[in-house]
Amino acid sequence: MSKIVKVIGREIIDSRGNPTVEAEVHLEGGFVGMAAAPSGASTGSREALELRDGDKSRFLGKGVLKALEAVNGPIAQALLGKDAKDQAAIDQIMIDLDGTENKSKFGANAILAVSLANAKAAAAAKGMPLYAHIAELNGTAGVYSMPLPMMNIINGGEHADNNVDIQEFMIQPVGAKTLKEAVRMGAEVFHNLAKVLKSKGYNTAVGDEGGFAPNLKSNAEALEVIAEAVAAAGYVLGKDITLAMDCAASEFYDAEKKEYNLKGEGRIFTSNEFSDYLADLTTKFPIVSIEDGLDESDWDGFAYQTKELGKKIQIVGDDLFVTNTKILKRGIDNGIANSILIKFNQIGSLTETLAAIKMAKDAGYTAVISHRSGETEDATIADLAVGTAAGQIKTGSMSRSDRVAKYNQLIRIEEALGAKAPFNGLKEVKGQA
């Protein structure tokens, strides 16, 4: 019933109007799984390769026909007759067939789409929801939790066309008792933020991840207007709502000069000075999590930042670790950061993603499940967050259906699981338990 009889790939469109790979895996029992690969804007240099055609006459070079050739050709042929329930074997076949360190032959976008579609097909064959199947693959059958959302309500950096250097300013509805209540609180702050921005004459157009993208006087002003919105929504900052930031600092790091250049503010920092700048912000605002607070190659700087802030703040590695167990192990061994961002297209398969989550948890690091700035209606990360009991999720703001699709799937899962999937709020954040 769970043998693969057909694998199909197609080119679909993501939330930025760019092509991406969607795959279907068909099983002999008539079960079908379908999944799409997301795409990042601020990407780590050590991520698995997203294969694009480079043909400027199609989609400005961003077509994925080469990746589809891999899905519909060698991958489909290699997987015929294989048992979809053996996810590790399915993923390993594709990895071995590709034969490169960074999946550059077939593309991580090709391998991941098939990997996730396979998991969905296997879940269907087993007659269980995807999150339950993921929990079994993870070796934690029946262990679930609802993740605390990090909601990106002001977008800057590579996610917006504005003067804000820091890429994401997020709220966490820690005062909520359930995921559904957290979503409501986030929506209320989001709508009040629109009012606050309008009252100041600021633009309320949104960026790639559905957050507002106004020009602001400083990065600190982003936190100030969010604080106003939280109060206007009737919530207490630091009690009901905490704050988080994704600096994506590699995007404003000058490797030659070894400087961090906040062009929007006209300020330049050394590595330790930028960590001190962030530390100062944490004394003025209830910031409990900082992601990619330095360049991905600035390991000495991260050691300093972790030492200075790591006992009270969650220090998340995204570009730093790129969901890669080899790089994460180096971080763990050297006391770098205390949390990893999980993006399965950075590594390119479900099995490798689960391995990164397990390694992080075993080392006492937290794992934050994340979307990419280029998304589709595919909501697999919601099931991944619940099925691994990861505890935290980043999936954008309260607008754009590519973001809201994940929140809606979480609401459905919470309704189905009830007390079996507790919402632990701030306890999930490193340094806050």
From Swiss-Prot:
UniProt remark on cofactor binding: Binds a second Mg(2+) ion via substrate during catalysis.
InterPro entries on file: Enolase, Enolase-like_C_sf, Enolase-like_N, Enolase_C, Enolase_CS, Enolase_N
Pathway stated in the Swiss-Prot or TrEMBL entry: Carbohydrate degradation; glycolysis; pyruvate from D-glyceraldehyde 3-phosphate: step 4/5
Localization: Cytoplasm; Secreted; Cell surface
A single GO BP: glycolytic process
Residue sites binding Mg(2+) per the record: D246, E291, D318
Residues involved in (2R)-2-phosphoglycerate binding: Q167, K343, R372, S373, K394
Cofactor(s) of this protein: Mg(2+)
Enzyme Commission number(s) of this protein: 4.2.1.11
Catalytic center residues: E209 (proton donor), K343 (proton acceptor)
Gene designation: eno
Function recorded in the entry: Catalyzes the reversible conversion of 2-phosphoglycerate (2-PG) into phosphoenolpyruvate (PEP). It is essential for the degradation of carbohydrates via glycolysis.
Name of the protein: Enolase
GO MF assignments: magnesium ion binding; phosphopyruvate hydratase activity
Catalytic reaction annotation: (2R)-2-phosphoglycerate = phosphoenolpyruvate + H2O
Enzyme superclass (EC): lyase
Assembly and interaction partners: Component of the RNA degradosome, a multiprotein complex involved in RNA processing and mRNA degradation.
Alphabetical list of PROSITE patterns matching this protein: ENOLASE
Domain of life the protein comes from: Bacteria
Keyword Lipid biosynthesis: no
SMART domains on file: Enolase_C (SM01192), Enolase_N (SM01193)
Keyword terms: Cytoplasm, Glycolysis, Lyase, Magnesium, Metal-binding, Secreted
